[in-house]
Amino acid sequence: MGDQRPRDRPRSPGMDCKPWYCDKPPSKYIAKRKHRRLRFPPMDTQNWVFVKESMDSFHYGCPSPEDMLICRLNEFLLPKISHRGPQADPKSRQKKLLKKVALFSKLLPAQPAWKAFVEEAQLMAKHPLAMYPNLGEDMPPDLLLQMLKLLDPERKLEKAWAYCEGREKTIKEPTKPEPPKAPVSHHFLEPPKIRASCLKELLQEDTPSTTECVSDSLQHRYTSRKMHDFKWARDMGVDEESIRNLFDFTPKWRATYEDQQIKKIKEWVSELQYRIKLDEMDEVESSQEKDWDRKLQMAPNSYTAQCVKMRYGVWYLKPKLGKKLRSDQPLIDPKLLLEKPDEPDILDDLYGPIAFKDFILSKGYEMPGIIERLCARKGWTYDSVKTPVQRAMRLYK
């Protein structure tokens, strides 16, 4: 009896409600999942296709749409379903395939036509060497042959190839000994590099024989730019010496780095030895430049910054009432700081007009109207405001 507990005990009013987890609504994920699209949609009977027994194997691609029959009843009770849609005609299917192939092809349909047009234009265009008909006369045959091998491998320029090949045969198999070549002039050639030792020998002795040799060699090797400009006259048959006599011979030659070196005073030309010392004016200018350079040199910074203590007034006053002062300076009364100072009048500092007034009066002239208005405005009289002009006038009279 003692173990038995009363089943119907009095409960508090809050105990009759549902627990907290029952009041919580279901999650939104479950509600959304109901309206979610299924992975496998329901079967559509309009796309059913009945096939033969031998055509249900798809190892070698899709079966042909022809000869589709219903399977035998003794073997299968239900039809076999394929999810293919209604098949189109073979002709329209070929057109669609051609369109897809054209889209995914690397070459556009207009590119082959453009390629053929470019090839035809290249065949119609002239050869690059056809613009120079006299190319064989101006170039040596060896260089011309190398150029033809690179630019004309198809042997379109038959005359040039025949000229080069015939020239090669004559060079390889000379029938008669060639006569000795005449001395060729060294015009329009690059100047040879003269070593420093050769120039040193030329500069040590300035004898007339050496100078003549040097001038002859330069005249023989180099020509002026004017001769190069009158090349057209030489082609017409004009004599070269007659053109040279009309103009002065001014050969141009630039020294190379090999010729530049440090030389002693003895090796200098006699004209340069007289200019070793400076003139009086040059010495004065050089001395002034040295003094000016010394002035420009900055003196060493001997200033050292020192720490200075600052204060802003008494601590029990407002910071606005204080003023920045050094620690050794006395404090300023805050009441004086609160009082606004009078705005300074510009005319108070005009000492010049007053002195001008005294000067005019001392000479016996009338006072200008501007100065009279100024004195009336400030309340000045001629005797109250005195300037040292009166005393100065007495001394100089």
Swiss-Prot record:
Q: Which domain of life is it from?
A: Eukaryota
Q: Which Pfam families does the annotation name?
A: FAM47
What PANTHER family does the annotation carry? PROTEIN FAM47B, PROTEIN FAM47C-RELATED
UniProt lists the family membership as follows: Belongs to the FAM47 family.
Q: Can you name this protein?
A: Putative protein FAM47D
Q: Which organism is it from?
A: Homo sapiens (Human)
